[in-house]
């Protein structure tokens, strides 16, 4: 059976992907920091193996991965610091965002890649963002991490393509997750939900479809965005 290891699996897209892959027959290891959330996830899908771990803790990750053969790695863990002008950001918030969103994904990938390359198979996915491909105010460091993830995924793909290991970047925009709930004020949330939003399950279904493709089909990146409201005249 195919084994998938997913970080940031306690909420949002990560949780949806864990459930969807479990339903599709994968052995799923769901990693996250909240033991309570992991317990809830396992109660909903008893076949999922919960892994309580901080993705920035190298020794803990090495211990967790020591006895697991991973076919699919989904680097989904991420945070968004408080919205605001870069000049006003706290240094601690900058450090934490870089560590969780970028360094942890690179570290985990480095720990898993050797076994995939040795087997000449595997699939690594990264949760990117539209913010990594377009400029938005008040999220400079978050955008930098997502742009870096995009670049890393592309370069990693070039490194690994001769070995048959595939790499896919997930570019999602305006997804209804707790992350957005946490950072937006009431007015911003109202504006966001007045238009259509992508659901975590939508992203999860795409991931299952991409992973089901034959070895000769390589989805290097997929974008999933909401359809925008249409005016009575038919223009967007």
Each language-model region and where it sits:
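Active-site helix of classical SDR
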Residues: 109, 145
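Residue(s) in the substrate-gating loop at a strand-loop-helix junction
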Residues: 129
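C-terminal helical subdomain
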Residues: 169-170, 186, 190-232
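Alpha-helical segment proximal to the catalytic Tyr-Lys
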Residues: 114, 158-159
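Substrate-binding pocket helix/loop in short-chain dehydrogenase/reductase
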Residues: 84-86, 93-95
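The beta1-alpha1 cofactor-binding region of Rossmann-like NAD(H)/NADP(H)-dependent oxidoreductases
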Residues: 51-63, 91
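Conserved glycine-rich cofactor-binding loop
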Residues: 10-11
